[in-house]
């Protein structure tokens, strides 16, 4: 090709003119006039918003929320973390149904029983002491003594005892003494069994002959869930879960690092 001459390229045909669609004009009713609201400070009434975040909650609610968040954020040692693994609903229902049969007598029932016994004695029919029926034993000290003497057949511990130090040693003690134990949701549920508001732990010592098979089934299921899994539970730490803000911040940093690396590699 001789110098000074430029190669002529093919001319591209111009794009066809885009045919604009004629939009039909909206008919505006003059009776409906626009009244735009101004939500600035001191202007119109603010719209209804979810202000839960800004409520000044009572102290006990604040504390329980902070405790729940701390349990998520901090590393929770296995001894405390094991109380998050409660018994499944079906087994817990069966257990409570059985425990309901062995509720201790109320103060009124005891009063009536002693009154009837006193009346018999006054009538000269002789005083025959009644045999103590098998009932649930409640309270940390009572249950600890029963476990140490290997008299407890099954120990039920509440998962939400506060302070947790009251019962934190019980699972290890039960395992050492070979007593089956389980952790159940709700100290209030256990409290209802023994006519109190709350209860930390209850224990079965004896049951009637008709309930022995039901208790044996429960003990078998509980033993596989708790006593036999003790080594696994002992290694499992809890918590260490970051909040949404921290997760977002870390994700942002990671994204920036990845972008920087991509530009370096080109």
From Swiss-Prot:
Read off the SUPFAM superfamilies from this record.
Answer: L30e-like
Q: Where in the cell is it found?
A: Cytoplasm
Q: Does the keyword Acetylation apply?
A: yes
Glycyl lysine isopeptide (Lys-Gly) (interchain with G-Cter in SUMO2) crosslink residues: 11, 20-21, 48, 97, 125, 245
Query: Which positions does the record annotate as the modified residue N6-acetyllysine?
Result: 34, 97, 217
Q: Which Pfam families match?
A: Ribosomal_L7Ae
GO CC terms in record: cytosolic large ribosomal subunit; membrane; nucleolus; synapse
Record-level Gene Ontology MF annotations: RNA binding; structural constituent of ribosome
- Which biological process annotations from GO are given for this protein? maturation of LSU-rRNA
The entry sums up its family as follows: Belongs to the eukaryotic ribosomal protein eL8 family.
The protein's matches in PANTHER family, at most eight in alphabetical order, are given as: RIBOSOMAL PROTEIN L7AE FAMILY MEMBER (PTHR23105)
Q: Return the protein name.
A: Large ribosomal subunit protein eL8
Give the species. Bos taurus (Bovine)
> What is this protein's gene name?
RPL7A
């Amino acid at each position: 090709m001789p110098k000074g001459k430029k190669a002529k390229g093919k001319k591209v045909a111009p794009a066809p003119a885009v045919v604009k669609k004629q939009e039909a004009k909206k008919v505006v009713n003059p009776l409906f006039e626009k009244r735009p609201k101004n939500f600035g400070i001191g202007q119109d009434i603010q719209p209804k918003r979810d202000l839960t975040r800004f409520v000044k909650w009572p102290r006990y609610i604040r504390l329980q929320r902070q405790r729940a968040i701390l349990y998520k954020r901090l590393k929770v040692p296995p001894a405390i973390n094991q109380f998050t693994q409660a018994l499944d609903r079906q087994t817990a229902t069966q257990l409570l149904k059985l425990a309901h049969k062995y509720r201790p007598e109320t103060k009124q029932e005891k009063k009536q029983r002693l009154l009837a016994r006193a009346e018999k004695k006054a009538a000269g029919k002789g005083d025959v002491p009644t045999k103590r029926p098998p009932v649930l034993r409640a309270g940390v000290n009572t249950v600890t003594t029963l476990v140490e003497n290997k008299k407890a057949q099954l120990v039920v511990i509440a998962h939400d005892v506060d302070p947790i130090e009251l019962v934190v040693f019980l699972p290890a003690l039960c395992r050492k003494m070979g007593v089956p134990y389980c952790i159940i949701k709700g100290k209030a549920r256990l409290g209802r069994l023994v006519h109190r508001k709350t209860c930390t732990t209850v224990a079965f010592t004896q049951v009637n002959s008709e309930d022995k098979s039901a208790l044996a089934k429960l003990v078998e299921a509980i033993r596989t869930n708790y006593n036999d899994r003790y080594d696994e539970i002992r290694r499992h730490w809890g918590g260490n879960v970051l909040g949404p803000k921290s997760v977002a911040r870390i994700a942002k940093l990671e994204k920036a690092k990845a972008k920087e690396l991509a530009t370096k590699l080109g």
